[in-house]
Structures are given as structure tokens and as C-alpha cells.
Amino acid sequence: IASVDCSDYPKPVCSLEYMPLCGSDSKTYSNKCNFCNAVVDSNGTLTLSHFGKC
């Protein structure tokens, strides 16, 4: 199972690097930072579906 360590998030600003991840909500997040911020916002209910676009 793919996983991402979001322990050092949330962060106030994310870089613009494009390394897409697909969340369990079927949304494509542009990079780990954006994904991890969303994970924190979801109180941990959002998980990684897979790396790459959904």
C-alpha cells in the first residue's frame, strides 16, 4: 500500500512542484504538500490512493 508521511504538516505555503498524488476522495493533488495539507484538514480521513493522477 502506498503511503506518505504527513507528520511535518500542515505547512502554510506549498511549492509549485508537480508530482501528482491521487487521494482516496478521487481528487488529484499536485504534490505531497497540497495532499498532506488536505489530509490534516480532513482529520486523517483522507488517505493516499496511489501516486500519479487519479
UniProtKB/Swiss-Prot annotation:
<keyword id="KW-0722">Serine protease inhibitor</keyword>
<keyword id="KW-0677">Repeat</keyword>
<keyword id="KW-0964">Secreted</keyword>
<feature type="disulfide bond">
    <location>
        <begin position="14"/>
        <end position="33"/>
    </location>
</feature>
<feature type="disulfide bond">
    <location>
        <begin position="22"/>
        <end position="54"/>
    </location>
</feature>
<protein>
    <recommendedName>
        <fullName>Ovomucoid</fullName>
    </recommendedName>
</protein>
<feature type="disulfide bond">
    <location>
        <begin position="6"/>
        <end position="36"/>
    </location>
</feature>
<keyword id="KW-0325">Glycoprotein</keyword>
<feature type="site" description="Reactive bond 3">
    <location>
        <begin position="16"/>
        <end position="17"/>
    </location>
</feature>
<dbReference type="InterPro" id="IPR051597">
    <property type="entry name" value="Bifunctional_prot_inhibitor"/>
</dbReference>
<feature type="domain" description="Kazal-like">
    <location>
        <begin position="4"/>
        <end position="54"/>
    </location>
</feature>
<keyword id="KW-0646">Protease inhibitor</keyword>
<dbReference type="InterPro" id="IPR001239">
    <property type="entry name" value="Prot_inh_Kazal-m"/>
</dbReference>
<dbReference type="Pfam" id="PF00050">
    <property type="entry name" value="Kazal_1"/>
</dbReference>
<keyword id="KW-1015">Disulfide bond</keyword>
<dbReference type="InterPro" id="IPR002350">
    <property type="entry name" value="Kazal_dom"/>
</dbReference>
<dbReference type="InterPro" id="IPR036058">
    <property type="entry name" value="Kazal_dom_sf"/>
</dbReference>
<feature type="glycosylation site" description="N-linked (GlcNAc...) asparagine">
    <location>
        <position position="43"/>
    </location>
</feature>
<dbReference type="GO" id="GO:0004867">
    <property type="term" value="F:serine-type endopeptidase inhibitor activity"/>
</dbReference>
<dbReference type="GO" id="GO:0005576">
    <property type="term" value="C:extracellular region"/>
</dbReference>
